[in-house]
Swiss-Prot record:
Disulfide linkage: none
UniProt gene name: kefB
Family: Belongs to the monovalent cation:proton antiporter 2 (CPA2) transporter (TC 2.A.37) family. KefB subfamily.
Record-linked InterPro entries: Cation/H_exchanger_TM, K/H_exchanger, K_H_efflux_KefB, Na+/solute_symporter_sf, NAD(P)-bd_dom_sf, RCK_N
Source organism per UniProt: Erwinia tasmaniensis (strain DSM 17950 / CFBP 7177 / CIP 109463 / NCPPB 4357 / Et1/99)
Record-annotated RCK N-terminal domain positions: 400-519
Signal peptide: none
Lineage: Bacteria, Pseudomonadati, Pseudomonadota, Gammaproteobacteria, Enterobacterales
Protein's name in the database: Glutathione-regulated potassium-efflux system protein KefB
Cellular component GO terms held in the UniProt record: plasma membrane
Length: 601
């Protein structure tokens, strides 16, 4: 029966999401708000299909965990070091200022000073899941406001630890005494995780990838995320912080893109479940009986946080067109409030209906954010269509690749080296793990992964790249990549390697006109030198080479519709006679006209 109830719950979540999210998108209110409304509909205060909300809410936090892992993969340690001032400067200022103002307002009501401190800290936190999702939807991750927003969220995650430790101290319980031995063991365990992750993760994934079984690689990625999350929870730290660190440790590895596409589907589903769970947790009974106090609390919360964030963004020097986005996307309460307020309630810091009032306020504030961001978008369209003042800080430079090279064998290496020598930004994808390990040992930026997977191409930057070079060995894979890019990334210029005429025909039929037959050019070059060794003048040998190249391409195009047809033989004979006639004409016309070609190259 328990298994059946679990299946029924899963079916309800899927049905709610499938119905509510498209409707929300049709109404223009966004997918996040659609998930929240779906949760209200099926929760205990809606149709009552789901009653155990807290258990589901705890499980759905894995969505935030997976999201933080992917963000860690995208953030190299060097980049994190560059953000240290915004993390510990703007992030710390936001938490302290917001907590002071909101806590002071709570103290002016019926809250004790201890409860006001915890309430202010909890309300100062923003929703990591909602903010990061909205930042991605609004493409804020490409500019400075997104980086600053991420810095604030990261500091909030770090602030979880001292905030939870503060609860028993304010409650005056015996548990407020610090167990230094236990604390030291936790610090050592955390340091062990960092060292072990730094030196063991790559060899482990190299061993797994060598098996060539994609499902095992996905299982290993899930094991890493869940294992690091549970390890951090056992230490009393944030699960999301643990997976974020694991992601950073692998950010510069060759497995980054493959890990991202392995985790991304789970992240999306669990994030949706998280938002549904938040909607289910909304206590409509408390809302109905205290509607005026709660609405006033939501307005107070959103207004104070927006004002504090806008002020900090201005001091930081953020572009005027980004301040509203930055302050709006972080204006809500967050999922950490549920944890902190529950801990405070267990020590009797809150009295009466204070805790449910705060939780409903936080939940409603999360529901206002998608609507608030729509309003921000409308304001920006009217006010900031023109270029900002030259004194303002420029957009962060986009480091997306200009070219994606698929395959790093002998052929792909030459192409990639030429591009890098000319300072072009490239990303190289290779599925042979031994080749990846070897090339990275020489300093090449090569990533392990199967480029026939749509999400890998997307993670590698195909949506913003200008060109894609297909230099892989397998013709089936090459054609699969061509069709995938033509369907999902039509802006890409596709340049491909063809092993022979058959592959060249297939590429032409698929609409790829820029290709190179891997042995053709080198064979032509050797043929030219052979002609010169027989006494032909360099100029004449070069012209013969170019004539042959043009005629061969004409033959290739002419024979393409009849590939495998009986007419092919006669067409080849006709082309050979045409080539002989051209050479004879060249000999008669260009005899002794070889100025500047006396030296062979």
């Amino acid at each position: 029966m328990e298994g059946q109830s679990l299946l029924m719950a899963g079916l309800l979540y899927l049905c709610a999401a499938v119905i509510a999210v498209p409707l929300a998108a049709r109404l223009g209110i966004g997918a996040v708000l659609g998930y929240l409304l779906a949760g209200i509909a099926i929760g205990p205060w809606g149709l009552g299909f789901i009653s155990d909300v807290q258990e589901i809410l705890h499980f759905s936090e894995l969505g935030v965990v997976f999201l933080m892992f992917i963000i860690g993969l995208e953030l190299k340690p060097s980049k994190l070091w560059e953000l240290r001032r915004s993390i510990f400067g703007v992030g710390a200022a936001q938490v302290l200022l917001s907590a002071a103002v909101l806590g002071g307002l709570l103290w002016l009501t019926d809250f004790s000073w201890q409860a006001a401190i915890i309430g202010g800290i909890g309300l100062a936190m923003s929703s990591t899941a909602m903010a990061l999702q909205l930042m991605r939807d609004k493409a804020m991750n490409r500019n400075e406001s997104g980086q600053l927003g991420f810095s604030v969220l990261l500091f909030q995650d770090l602030a979880v630890i001292p905030a939870l430790a503060l609860v028993p101290l304010l409650a005056g319980s015996d548990s407020g005494h610090t167990d230094w031995m236990k604390l030291g063991m936790k610090v050592l365990a955390f340091a062990g995780m960092l060292v072990g992750g730094r030196y063991l993760l790559r060899p482990i994934f190299r061993f797994i990838a060598a098996s060539g079984v994609r499902e095992v690689f996905t299982a290993a990625a899930l094991l890493l995320v869940l294992g690091s999350a549970l390890f951090m929870e056992a230490l009393g730290l944030s699960m999301a912080l643990g997976t974020f660190i694991a992601g950073i440790l692998l950010a510069e590895s060759e497995y980054r893109h493959e890990l991202e596409i392995a985790i991304d589907p789970f992240k999306g589903l669990l994030l949706g479940l998280f938002f549904i769970s938040v909607g289910m947790a909304l206590n409509l009974g408390v809302l109905y009986t205290h509607i005026l106090e709660i609405l006033a609390g939501v307005v107070m919360l959103v207004t104070v946080k927006t004002a504090v964030l806008y002020l900090l963004a201005r001091i930081y020097g953020l572009r005027s067109s980004e301040r509203l986005q930055f302050s709006g996307v972080l204006s809500q309460g967050g999922e950490f409030a549920f944890v902190l307020f529950s801990a405070a309630s267990s020590t009797s810091l809150f009295s009466g209906d204070q805790m449910p009032l705060l939780l409903v306020t936080v939940t409603l504030s999360m529901m206002t954010t998608p609507l608030l961001m729509q309003g921000v978008d409308k304001i920006l369209k009217h006010r900031f269509n023109e270029v900002d003042d030259s004194q303002e800080k420029p957009f962060v430079e986009d480091d997306k690749p200009q070219v994606i090279v698929v395959g790093f064998g002998r052929f792909g290496q030459v192409v990639a080296r030429l591009l890098m020598a000319n300072e072009k930004r490239i990303t190289v994808l290779e599925r042979d793990i031994s080749a990846v390990s070897l090339m990275r040992s020489y300093g090449y930026k090569v990533y392990y992964g199967d480029a026939t997977q749509l999400e890998l191409l997307r993670a590698a930057g195909a949506e913003t790249a200008q060109s894609l070079v297909i230099a892989c060995n397998g013709p089936e894979d090459a054609m699969a990549i061509v069709h995938l890019c033509q369907q999902h990334f039509p802006h890409l210029q596709i340049l491909a390697r063809a092993r022979g005429r058959v592959e060249a025909h297939e590429l032409l039929q698929a609409g790829v006109t820029q290709f190179s037959r891997e042995t053709f050019s080198s064979a032509l070059e050797l043929g030219r030198k052979t002609l010169m060794s027989l006494g032909m003048h360099p100029h004449q040998a070069f012209r013969a080479q170019q004539h042959f190249r043009r005629l061969d391409m004409r033959m290739l195009r002419a024979l393409m519709p009849n590939h495998g047809d009986s007419q092919q033989i006669s067409r080849v004979k006709e082309a050979r006679r045409e080539l002989e006639d051209i050479f004879q004409a060249e000999l008669r016309h260009e005899k002794r006209q070889f100025d500047g070609w006396d030296e062979a190259d």
